[in-house]
């Protein structure tokens, strides 16, 4: 009796290595000056994420804005995992799940901003005030760690890399999002 081997045709869309996930969510509040306003912005990020935010320094002096080199002017925080998905969901709800095509980068990431942090469900505190913040979402696939690990690092193949269209399709499927085409 001869062994019969069958060739199984696999659908590339069902390959688990092609699934997209959120690698990290970066939240940023740029105040443009150091001092009390910056520490209050840090409190906002700490309330939102439950993590200790990091201060960003100015790269160079801009006299017209009154910014000196190495002066702390912004605060940011990186969130991963389920907490990142939950915060992103709240941010997209503020934007009514609408993003422009220009919000997506060629490497498959996307970002957007909101005007007021209190729209995210944080109670308004008069001593803190109202701050706007930027969301930046970095997407990835299984196997992307090859590029970032210290030992035996490699590169992600061209077919496995994310494109702008992949990110837009993922956003539309996962969040039932609307992508607006803006014309100049």
UniProtKB/Swiss-Prot annotation:
Signal peptide: none annotated. GO terms for cellular component: cytoplasm; cytosolic large ribosomal subunit; cytosolic ribosome; nucleolus. It is found in: Nucleus; Cytoplasm. GO terms for molecular function: RNA binding; rRNA binding; structural constituent of ribosome. Transmembrane segments: none annotated. Keywords: Cytoplasm, Nucleus, Ribonucleoprotein, Ribosomal protein, RNA-binding, rRNA-binding. Pfam families: Ribosomal_L5, Ribosomal_L5_C. This is Large ribosomal subunit protein uL5. It comes from Drosophila melanogaster (Fruit fly).
């Amino acid at each position: 009796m001869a062994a019969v081997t069958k060739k199984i045709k696999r659908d590339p869309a069902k390959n688990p290595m092609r699934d997209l996930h959120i690698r990290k969510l970066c939240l940023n509040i740029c105040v443009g000056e150091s001092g009390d306003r910056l520490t209050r912005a840090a409190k906002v990020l700490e309330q939102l994420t439950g993590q200790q935010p990091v201060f960003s320094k100015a790269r160079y002096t801009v006299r017209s804005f009154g910014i000196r080199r190495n002066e702390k002017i912004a605060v940011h925080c990186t969130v991963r995992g389920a907490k990142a998905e939950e915060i992103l969901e709240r941010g997209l709800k503020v934007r009514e799940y609408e993003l422009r095509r220009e919000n997506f980068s060629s490497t498959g990431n996307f970002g957007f901003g909101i005007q007021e942090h209190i729209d995210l469900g944080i109670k308004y505190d008069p001593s803190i005030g109202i701050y706007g913040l930027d969301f930046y979402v970095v997407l990835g696939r299984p196997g992307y760690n090859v590029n970032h690990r210290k030992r035996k690092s490699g590169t992600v193949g061209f077919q496995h890399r994310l494109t702008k269209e992949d990110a837009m399709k993922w956003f539309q499927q996962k969040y039932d999002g609307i992508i607006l085409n803006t014309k100049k």
